[in-house]
């Protein structure tokens, strides 16, 4: 399951990037970003990597909670 709060968190620490801006840079719809943030959609590996690169974090930081790493 996607950790929905992490994408939103990293969007905001990256200059308060909007869902639309992140979606545009990632090549997906704004609705897709909203669904990822809401935990309703798990991104493909390609999209997870793309989002992590745009946001400047690792895939693990973006999608794996601390509990899952233990």
Predicted regions and their residues:
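Short, charged recognition helix plus adjacent turn
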Residues: 53, 63-70
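Short, basic-rich loop-to-helix N-cap that marks the start of a DNA-contacting helix
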Residues: 40-50, 69
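Helix-turn-helix DNA-binding elements, focusing on the entry/boundary residues of the two helices
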Residues: 19, 30, 45-48
């Amino acid at each position: 399951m996607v950790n929905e709060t992490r994408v939103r968190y990293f969007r905001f620490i990256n200059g308060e990037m909007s869902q639309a801006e992140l979606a545009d840079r990632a090549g997906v719809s704004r609705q897709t970003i909203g669904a990822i943030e809401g935990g309703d959609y798990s991104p493909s590996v390609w999209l997870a990597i793309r989002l992590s690169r745009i946001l400047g974090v690792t895939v693990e930081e973006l999608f794996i909670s601390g509990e899952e790493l233990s």
